[in-house]
Amino acid sequence: MDILSYKQTNERSDMEPPAQDSGARNGFPAPGESPLFDQGLALRKKVLGDEYVDRSIEAADDFTRPLQKMITEWCWGEGWGNPALPPKTRSMLNIAMLTALNRKEELKLHVRGAIRNGVSVEEIQAVLLQACIYCGVPAALDSTKAAREALKDIGAIP
């Protein structure tokens, strides 16, 4: 079923139209309207940087907005907002998991975030070496190259 067919069969004429957005957050919950979104947005910006997150939020359209909202509330608000693990540990876990998944662009983003969260270059290197054992040499080679690029971009290594 395509999106248009789904929309036509799932729309109800008796439903209220969505409230008009003030434009302050491009269709996302207004500040204070969703505490989980607010918490997630703050954590996301702290780790990934204001510029990257603002670009993602501003670029969202009707098709991508639900995913951006879910990422902000669920991944960042619920996941990163859970105090059981400190941000530094979460960053190291993400580096290992992104290595396993061979997601180089996302890895670069999280390497920069790891530095913001207090992970040292030596710890990033150790995580990549550990991941090599369980994820394999090809994944470790790609991830190490991506991590090096990210670290050079932010001046963490020469």
List where the protein language model places each region.
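Substrate/cofactor-recognition hotspot
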Residues: 130, 137-141
